[in-house]
UniProtKB/Swiss-Prot annotation:
Assembly mode: Forms a cylinder of 14 subunits composed of two heptameric rings stacked back-to-back. Interacts with the co-chaperonin GroES.
Name of this chain's protein: Chaperonin GroEL
Role played: Together with its co-chaperonin GroES, plays an essential role in assisting protein folding. The GroEL-GroES system forms a nano-cage that allows encapsulation of the non-native substrate proteins and provides a physical environment optimized to promote and accelerate protein folding.
Sequence similarity: Belongs to the chaperonin (HSP60) family.
């Protein structure tokens, strides 16, 4: 396939045009008075959103060289989203500013490699300044503010803060679409896993179709139970004690299941059987989690234990167990606190070591069930279009709060970059030649987020930047009220992780793009149209 090649300033100009087209589309969403972008979908209703990475992913340009530039910016947005979960629009705006400023200097004869070195030094200095300005998140109120700024909605902020407070940092918060118009928060206390009763005859409440066992014994095994004789001695002891039993096994089938159901219906004893959660090695780990949480033992051949030898003191205990068609929740397990703490730190260690995102997610879920809890935010809206937009904003808010808890917060609204630029200006004075020019590129780019926040509010960015520069650290411009205020006191906060990641990723891509001297793209070949009448005449067969 034939290729087209462009060199020097022509190649850079084409890439720069692609960067501008994508960045100009995304930057209209920045700030409290930012607008939305409507995205055409190949099926269903268009998507209306202000989420930078969602917009960036949709942009494909016709010109191959311009498209390469756009794809590079898309990488900045995606990488920032992966690391921090928010700040994608800021990262895009920073990249555009760096590319525009850098290209001017290259045309004036700057050396791109030395320029890049200066950009890297200035970025490191700015990141250091951002970290120095950071403060730890204090209380639920600040968490709510971080979420509200990210989503542009106070109600969302309060909901996310409630969820974070209830499940703690180890908990898992998931976001789902609601069946109603209301947005609500559901909290699952205790250990929940997605397996339900093996037979509806085991229900204790036929109206709700669920089985509730108070203070039950819990048999945990990775074996199949098909012969009732295997667990008969144990069942007799349970009946004598007048207790209830939850069986968690690989499966309960045949004669064993029939006998359990018949005795349940006769009222001989109250028993519920569920399948073990997970598969393979993950199943073994989850059964071990349940055993530690309830103070029982996993009856497994791996440990040399057989069902027929099981005694009552090998069983777990819990305050209550609720079993539905597809879920089981164990509340207040009777496990030893030290053993549970040991298991939690073991899972944390595995999370730190694993490189697989999938494994990390599953381990995080296990950690939440052991230590925190699981909260589900169900997002409701009048139409599907509004619901999808609200769900994206909710996800951004959740990611922003997690980032804030992790690395702390700083003044929001682009003002942190302005105050960090004072440190970069000091560095610029110590550099020489094109390194100095590279550092100045970053110095100029740090003004871009505040400039566009002001521009989207219909104000003159340059004037506002100068006023913020002259003010005390922590002071910034509140574009919603058009006032200069102490940003942290007024709840206009950004997570350091988001601010830092956006700057580092923008510099990484922009400095690499500026070192480009030639670009190669595939020439699109027009596919000839099918001649008229081709395919006709088949009826003659």
């Amino acid at each position: 396939m034939a290729k087209e090649i462009k060199y020097g300033s022509e190649a850079r100009a084409a890439l720069g045009a692609g960067v501008d087209k994508l960045a100009n589309t995304v930057r209209v969403t920045l700030g409290p008075k930012g607008r939305n972008v409507v995205l055409d979908k190949s099926y269903g209703a268009p998507l209306i959103t202000n989420d930078g990475v969602t917009i960036a992913k949709e942009v494909e340009l016709e010109d191959a060289f311009e498209n390469m530039g756009a794809q590079l910016v898309k990488e900045v947005a995606t990488k920032t989203n992966d690391v921090a979960g928010d700040g994608t629009t800021t990262a895009t705006v920073l990249t555009q500013a760096m590319v525009q400023e850098g290209m001017k200097n290259l045309e004036a004869g700057a050396n791109p490699i030395v320029l890049r070195r200066g950009m890297k030094k200035a970025t490191d200095k700015a990141v250091e300044a951002l970290k120095d300005m950071s403060q730890k998140v204090k209380g639920k109120e600040q968490i709510a503010k971080v979420a509200a700024i990210s989503a542009g909605d106070e109600e969302v902020g309060n909901l996310v803060a409630d969820a974070m407070e209830k499940v703690t940092n180890d908990g898992v918060i998931t976001i789902e679409e609601s069946k109603t118009m209301q947005t609500e928060l559901d909290l699952v206390e205790g250990m929940q896993f997605d397996r339900g009763y093996l037979s509806a005859y085991m229900c204790t409440d036929m109206d709700k179709m669920e089985a509730v066992l108070d203070d039950p014994y819990i048999l945990i095994t990775d074996k199949k139970i098909s012969n009732i004789q295997d667990i008969l001695p144990l069942l007799e002891k349970i009946v004598q004690a007048g207790a209830r039993l939850l069986i968690i096994a690989e499966d309960v089938e045949g004669e064993a299941l029939t006998t359990l159901i018949v005795n349940k219906l006769r009222g001989t004893f109250n028993v519920v059987a569920v399948k073990a959660p997970g598969y393979g090695d993950r199943r073994k780990a989850m059964l071990e989690d349940i055993a530690i949480l309830t103070g029982g033992q996993v009856i497994s051949s791996d440990l040399g234990l057989e069902l027929k030898d099981t005694t009552i003191d090998m069983l777990g205990r819990a305050k209550s167990v609720k079993v539905q068609k597809e879920n089981t929740v164990i509340v207040d397990g009777a496990g030893d606190k030290d053993a549970i703490a040991g298991r939690v730190s073991q899972i944390r260690g595995q999370i730190d070591e694993t490189t697989s995102e999938f494994d990390k997610e599953k381990l995080q879920e296990r950690l939440a069930k052991m230590a925190g809890g699981v909260a589900v935010i169900r997002v409701g809206a009048a139409t599907e279009t509004e619901m999808k937009e609200a769900k994206l904003r909710m996800e951004d808010a959740l990611n922003a709060t997690r980032a804030a808890v992790e690395e702390g917060i700083i003044a929001g609204g682009g003002s942190a970059y302005i105050h960090a630029s004072k440190k970069v200006a000091e560095l610029v004075d110590t550099l020489e030649g094109d390194e100095k020019t590279g550092a100045k590129v970053i110095l100029k780019a740090l003004e871009a987020p505040l400039y566009y926040i002001a521009a989207n509010a219909g104000l003159e960015g340059a004037v506002i930047i100068n006023k913020v520069k002259e003010s005390a650290p922590g002071t910034g411009f509140n574009a919603a009220t058009e006032e200069y205020v102490d940003m942290v006191d007024n709840g206009i906060l950004d997570p350091v992780k988001v601010t830092r990641s956006a700057l580092q990723n923008a510099t990484s891509v922009a400095s690499t793009l500026l070192t480009t001297e030639s670009a190669v793209a595939t020439i699109k070949e027009d596919t000839p149209a099918m001649p008229a009448g081709a395919g006709a005449g088949m009826g003659m067969m």
